Amino acid sequence: MIEAIALREHPELCDAAIAYFQATWASDASLMVYDDCIRHSLTTENLLPRWYLLTDDGAIIGCAGLITNDFISRMDLYPWICALYVEKSHRGRALGQRLLARAEADARRAGFSAVYLCTDHIGYYEHYGYTHIGTGYHPWGESSRIYEKKL
């Protein structure tokens, strides 16, 4: 059975989640960013950050996060959905939407009226109700499209 689960509800998966996020998103220089952030997210009383896993009978097949900022210039906007990923072997079945929906629901319950994300993908997020609202700039000199979804 495929499920989108919140890591806060399954802290026993912490090490596996960190390894998955690192393998999927991190460079050698950023390995500890995921380790430190995910570990501390399990014990904070703050609303954010939150991390999610997509599992198929216990095997991790995808991930996402809900964070205060995704290393982008628009720090006036939050929360941000980040690190959305579904294994290639499981794509084409709207499984990414399950992760988006889980993060959106948590943001709504926390009192947020919108969520944001930055990406270079055009067409995917629009399919799930996201609207392109502008461009943001990253500290490493690149830019990304910014999307918003009203909750």
Language-model features: where?
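Active-site rim helix/loop that mediates acceptor-substrate recognition in acyltransferases
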Residues: 26-53
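Conserved beta-strand in the GNAT
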Residues: 53, 59-69, 80, 85
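Active-site beta-strand termini and strand-to-loop segments that position acidic
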Residues: 55-57, 149-150
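Conserved acetyl-CoA-binding loop-helix of GNAT-fold acetyltransferases
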Residues: 86, 92-105, 117
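Conserved active-site alpha-helix within GNAT-family acetyltransferase domains
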Residues: 109, 113, 119-143
